Amino acid sequence: MKLKKKFLEKSKKIAEERIDILMNLAEKESKDGKTDRSKNYVVLGKKIAMRMRMPYPKEWKRRICKNCGSFLIYGKNSRVRTKAKNYPHVVITCLECNSITRIPIKTEKK
């Protein structure tokens, strides 16, 4: 049983490294304007995470559009705004499919 646990930990670490490599490639290709290739890298990364039954890393999860799956580069194919109407939050708009993602900002309690 202990051997299986070590194997799973090692394979999850390898999967994290591969996801990181794929997302860096997706970022590079998206900056060059090859959005179809960057979408393929994003799909491959998601498949690896699902296969290993691990959550997608948070720093990459927010850089992917949930609707169309494109890699978001702020200012190029997405728009980022801060709003503070009802509750303070960041609004990320994908300019390819016009979907909106809201991320709440945690405020300090006094």
Curated annotation (Swiss-Prot):
Family note: Belongs to the eukaryotic/archaeal RNase P protein component 4 family.
Cofactor section: Zn(2+)
EC number: 3.1.26.5
Keywords: Cytoplasm, Endonuclease, Hydrolase, Metal-binding, Nuclease, tRNA processing, Zinc
Molecular-function GO terms, alphabetical: ribonuclease P activity; zinc ion binding
Reactions this protein catalyses: Endonucleolytic cleavage of RNA, removing 5'-extranucleotides from tRNA precursor
Record flagged with keyword Cell membrane: no
Function description: Part of ribonuclease P, a protein complex that generates mature tRNA molecules by cleaving their 5'-ends.
Signal peptide (UniProt feature, chain positions): none
Assembly description: Consists of a catalytic RNA component and at least 4-5 protein subunits.
UniProt record, GO biological process: tRNA 5'-leader removal
Gene3D superfamilies linked to this entry: 6.20.50.20, Immunoglobulin FC, subunit C
Binding residues annotated for Zn(2+), in chain numbering: 65, 68, 94, 97
Enzyme class, spelled out: hydrolase
Gene: rnp4
Any GO CC annotation of this UniProt entry: ribonuclease P complex
Record note on cofactor: Binds 1 zinc ion per subunit.
Entries under InterPro entries matching the protein: RNP4, Rpr2/Snm1/Rpp21
UniProt-recorded name of the protein: Ribonuclease P protein component 4
Location within or outside the cell: Cytoplasm
